[in-house]
Amino acid sequence: MITAPFFTLDRRDLLGIEGLSAPEIVGLLDLAEEFVVLNRQIEKKRSTLRGRTQVNLFFEASTRTQSSFELAGKRLGADVMNMSVGNSSVKKGETLIDTAMTLNAMRPDILVVRHHASGAVALLARKVDCCVVNAGDGAHEHPTQALLDALTIRRNKGRIEGLTVAVCGDVLHSRVARSNILLLHTLGARVRVVAPSTLLPTGIENFGVEVHRSMESGLEGADIVMMLRLQRERMAGSFIPSVKEYFHYYGLDEAKLKRAKPDALVMHPGPMNRGVEIDSAVADGAQSLIREQVEMGVAVRMAVLDALARKLPNATGAERD
């Protein structure tokens, strides 16, 4: 069994990439590298969270993120409880604050929360006494997705600084895009966003990105092509003429990918809409990192839980205020 180096985040919660320093991000990525090694061994357990309780509270349905956090917690020795909101008091009219206070009375050590409203996780974090991890809030942030994407890029390219990363698709509704832009910018990458005007948030230029409205110009010379899911469930109006037309202009196929560098790599946070934002030949091709992203997700979430756990009372290596 490996012995990972101690790394402690100087905060109780991980609510977003915004506010994280470059050394904090790199520290989490370095720790996650150790967990990649651990997860490829027969014995995958560590005891950082032994005796601790982790509650996964998902107000939005998720398969991969919830499963990834559950596996991460269990591999660190935590008692993990998945709370089904569909069968909870929330469906009976209980407010988010009431839910937070009820959970807090049960004295969990870590809450992993996904919510459909931007800012809801930060609000909940102010009402509880335990560590809180944002597993995605509205169109705001998804910090662990950005961290796992960064780890995937760094392992395959050897660096992040100086790379050109094209983030393509439904930027408007994407918390993944926002967190990735913040992280990549912090670590020195050149970031482009590629989307039709209807799927670009107002003021996106203020994030220090290049804005392209065509895949042809946006992918030119890119090192990484990061596709985003078209989130039709969040679209109340007509953001695109049709799925067929969207794929024609903004779906990643082999012809469009040739605009990027010959050694460019393709990413997607999942779940994918094949034939909408990405062609199967590209998703399953030699340049795709999509399956590797899933593996990195468990390691990154273990790193986040491990780093936050060291701030818990009586934790090994814990800092006391």
From Swiss-Prot:
Q: What pathway does the annotation place this protein in?
A: Pyrimidine metabolism; UMP biosynthesis via de novo pathway; (S)-dihydroorotate from bicarbonate: step 2/3
**What keywords appear on the UniProt entry?**
Pyrimidine biosynthesis, Transferase
Its domain of life reads: Bacteria
Show the Gene3D superfamilies listed in the entry.
Answer: Aspartate/ornithine carbamoyltransferase (3.40.50.1370)
PROSITE patterns assigned to the protein according to its UniProt record, in alphabetical order:
CARBAMOYLTRANSFERASE
What cellular component terms from Gene Ontology apply here? Answer: cytosol
Which terms under GO biological process does the entry name? 'de novo' pyrimidine nucleobase biosynthetic process; 'de novo' UMP biosynthetic process; amino acid metabolic process
| UniProt xrefs under InterPro entries | Asp/Orn_carbamoyltranf_P-bd, Asp/Orn_carbamoylTrfase, Asp/Orn_carbamoylTrfase_sf, Asp_carbamoyltransf, Asp_carbamoyltransf_Asp/Orn-bd
Give residues annotated as binding L-aspartate.
K92, R175, R229
Coiled-coil positions: none
| Gene Ontology terms, MF aspect | amino acid binding; aspartate carbamoyltransferase activity
What is this enzyme's class at the first EC digit?
transferase
Q: Where does carbamoyl phosphate bind?
A: R64, T65, R114, H142, Q145, G270, P271
Q: Does the keyword Disulfide bond apply?
A: no
Query: What disulfide bonds does the UniProt entry report for this chain?
Result: none
Q: Which reaction does it catalyse?
A: carbamoyl phosphate + L-aspartate = N-carbamoyl-L-aspartate + phosphate + H(+)
User: Which residues span the membrane?
Assistant: none
State the oligomer form and interacting partners.
Heterododecamer (2C3:3R2) of six catalytic PyrB chains organized as two trimers (C3), and six regulatory PyrI chains organized as three dimers (R2).
Family per record: Belongs to the aspartate/ornithine carbamoyltransferase superfamily. ATCase family.
Function as written in the Swiss-Prot or TrEMBL entry: Catalyzes the condensation of carbamoyl phosphate and aspartate to form carbamoyl aspartate and inorganic phosphate, the committed step in the de novo pyrimidine nucleotide biosynthesis pathway.
Q: State the name under which the record lists this protein.
A: Aspartate carbamoyltransferase catalytic subunit
**Which organism encodes this protein?**
Azorhizobium caulinodans (strain ATCC 43989 / DSM 5975 / JCM 20966 / LMG 6465 / NBRC 14845 / NCIMB 13405 / ORS 571)
